[in-house]
């Protein structure tokens, strides 16, 4: 029998809004073929951020879904697997119960990653995409901002070195849950939300006051919504936007309340509730870091899981580069406290 020339790997992400699986065949980090993708929407984040626990009914739903994913993995002959959970599971008071139930019913061991590791995993995938577009951060600065349902990760890269990394608990769903429905519908919501967000941005403003930043790189759950509102291709791997275009959209949204947003942009109420937090957070970040061009990438956390599994295993130079990069961040943190 002819020996297989590739390995089959499955990455599973238990996110705040989606439980996703991606199965690939790979030889090395440059020869990867996606053979299956599954995405199932859940309200995991809303439950955790509001009630601090994952209800039993949702635990059962998650286990049933993962049993289905496990059957698919068996059908595709998956040899390697990584299952990782982020904010919603990380903050659930009954996290251990969920992980035990998943293991008992599926045999899958779930790794719950902390926020710095979550942001770094996503960053590696984004950086790889930017390099493929000829954007490497050499001789200039880039600020990467990843906004998820439960958190905001900010990474400043200058001359291909990580110079600053900070994480904030101000994700989109978390922000939405901080205001009730009546507050979100009011015309004063913009002002209240701006003040709410600005109060957390002081450390970033101070750390980046002398930074020379050419590109603002945006990623995260709601970037597809932003592209849709701008009338741009939501399926593009990389999208470049002039800062003026974004500010025009911000000025338009700034004058609207929730019912008006639904009417103007022809979107569902559940989606419209995320528009103001998303737009206002982006606008506040852009005010912190004046830049002429914004780049949006479609990379997800699951892409980072895949890259960090395959890359170091198949490419020694890439493994060494990751180590060097992590050391640059450690050295920078050390200098900050000296």
Language-model-detected regions and their locations in the chain:
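Entry/capping segment at the start of metal-dependent catalytic domains
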Residues: 1-11
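Helical "lid/coupling" subdomains associated with nucleotide-phosphate turnover
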Residues: 9, 43, 47-71, 75-76, ...
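Short glycine-aspartate micro-motif
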Residues: 9-13, 142-146
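Active-site neighborhood of HAD-like aspartate-dependent phosphohydrolases
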Residues: 10, 23-26
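Short beta-strand scaffold segments in enzyme catalytic cores
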Residues: 19-24, 152-156, 305-306
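Beta-strand initiation motifs
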Residues: 29-35, 161-166
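N-terminal glycine-rich anion-binding loops that anchor highly charged ligand groups
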Residues: 32-42, 76
């Amino acid at each position: 029998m002819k020996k297989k020339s590739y390995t089959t790997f499955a990455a599973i992400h238990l996110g705040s809004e989606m439980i996703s699986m991606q199965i690939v065949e790979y030889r090395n980090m440059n020869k990867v073929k996606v053979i299956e993708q599954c995405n199932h929407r859940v309200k995991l984040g809303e439950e955790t951020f509001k009630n601090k626990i994952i209800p039993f009914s949702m635990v059962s739903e998650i286990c049933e879904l993962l049993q289905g994913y496990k059957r698919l993995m068996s059908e595709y002959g998956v040899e390697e697997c990584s299952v990782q959970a982020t904010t919603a599971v990380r903050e659930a008071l009954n996290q251990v119960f969920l992980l035990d139930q998943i293991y008992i019913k599926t045999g899958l061991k779930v790794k719950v990653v902390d926020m710095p590791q979550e942001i770094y995993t996503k960053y590696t995938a984004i950086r790889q995409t930017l390099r493929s577009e000829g954007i490497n951060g050499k001789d200039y600065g880039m600020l990467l901002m990843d906004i998820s349902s439960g958190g905001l990760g900010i990474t400043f890269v200058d001359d291909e070195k990580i110079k600053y990394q900070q994480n904030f608990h101000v994700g989109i769903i978390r922000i939405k849950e901080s205001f009730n429905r009546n507050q979100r519908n009011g015309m004063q919501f913009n002002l209240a939300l701006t003040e709410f967000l600005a109060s957390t941005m002081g450390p970033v403003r101070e750390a980046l006051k002398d930074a020379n930043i050419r590109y603002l790189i945006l990623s995260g759950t709601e970037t597809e919504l932003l592209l849709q509102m701008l009338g741009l291709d939501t399926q593009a791997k990389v999208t470049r936007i002039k800062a003026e275009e974004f500010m025009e959209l911000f000025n338009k949204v700034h004058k609207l309340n929730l019912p008006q947003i639904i009417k103007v942009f022809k979107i569902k109420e559940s989606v419209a509730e995320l528009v103001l937090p998303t737009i206002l957070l982006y606008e506040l970040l852009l005010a912190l870091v004046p830049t002429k061009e914004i780049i949006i990438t479609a990379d997800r956390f699951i892409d980072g899981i895949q890259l960090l599994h395959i890359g170091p295993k198949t490419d020694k130079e890439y493994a060494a580069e990751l180590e060097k990069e992590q050391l640059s961040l450690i050295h920078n943190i050390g200098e900050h406290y000296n």
